[in-house]
């Protein structure tokens, strides 16, 4: 270039203006906060989705169990009616006719199928840690196994009051279970509606703990109390029907002894369940 031309600083190779380090740090911190906020939002969304999934899974499981219990109850009631009819046609004190044996075997097969369904329901409840509901279904399963035995050759083709009473116990237990499941599903539905109306986003820890369980402790304890009251009533009725139980030297019928053993085991299990709830809830043992 000629001597008369002037060069700009850039043309002369002058260094560019330096940026403020504090400004760079501030921008980096802002970006970091934005990233952290985005991660927190994503995590919160995932937690909400997980809670929603668990709630829907439990509702579906409750519905399936309730549906299965209703099916068991319907099938069992049909066999109760069939047994009453079969027993009414028997000759008292006589040999069991071939026709009656065939009928009792058919009833036994159906009751055995109900017992198999009870096994699956009990396994599902046990996996969810539902103590009392699981115990009820296990008891139903055991009673049905005894009924099947008594209806067959091993049990002497029984069809009278004792077997029918055991069938009644099964019906009562399944009915209580059905009602308790309906109440729990209704409670969940009402709770969900209240949350939607209030636009409630968070629950305190106690509510969260309760929602994690398929059935809350309060519902289980109510059913456990009902079991205890029913057992006490059955024991009293058995004592009224068999005054010989008051005589320590009386020779008791083997079937009566089996019934007493059955009731004693149920009483033991109820006590053990109450103990488990005391430990779970941190309630001290009674003096």
What are these language model-derived features?
Residues 1-287:
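Mature extracytoplasmic or organellar-lumen-exposed domains after removal of signal/transit peptides
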């Amino acid at each position: 270039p000629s001597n008369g031309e002037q060069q700009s600083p850039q043309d002369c190779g002058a260094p560019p203006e330096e940026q403020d380090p504090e400004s760079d740090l501030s921008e980096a911190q802002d970006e970091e906060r934005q990233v952290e906020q985005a991660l927190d939002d994503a995590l919160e969304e995932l937690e909400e989705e997980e809670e929603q999934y668990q709630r829907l899974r439990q509702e579906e499981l409750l519905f399936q169990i309730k549906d299965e219990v209703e099916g068991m109850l319907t099938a069992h009631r049909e066999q109760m009616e069939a047994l009453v009819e079969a027993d009414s046609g028997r000759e008292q004190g006589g040999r069991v006719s071939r026709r009656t044996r065939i009928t009792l075997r058919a009833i036994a097969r159906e009751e055995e199928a109900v017992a198999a369904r009870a096994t699956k329901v009990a396994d599902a409840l046990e996996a969810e840690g539902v103590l009392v509901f699981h115990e009820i279904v296990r008891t139903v399963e055991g009673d049905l196994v005894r009924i099947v035995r008594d209806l067959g050759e091993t049990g002497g083709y029984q069809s009278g009051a004792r077997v029918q009473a055991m069938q009644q116990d099964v019906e009562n237990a399944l009915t209580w279970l059905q009602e308790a499941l309906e109440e729990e599903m209704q409670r969940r539905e009402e709770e969900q509606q209240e949350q939607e109306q209030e636009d409630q986003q968070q629950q305190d820890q106690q509510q969260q703990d309760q929602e994690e369980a398929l059935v809350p402790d309060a519902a289980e304890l109510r059913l456990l109390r009902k079991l205890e009251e029913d057992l006490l009533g059955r024991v009293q009725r058995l004592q009224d029907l068999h005054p010989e139980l008051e005589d320590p030297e009386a020779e008791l019928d083997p079937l009566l002894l089996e019934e007493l053993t059955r009731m004693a085991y149920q009483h033991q299990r109820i006590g053990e369940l109450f103990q488990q709830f005391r430990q779970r809830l941190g309630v001290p043992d009674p003096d």
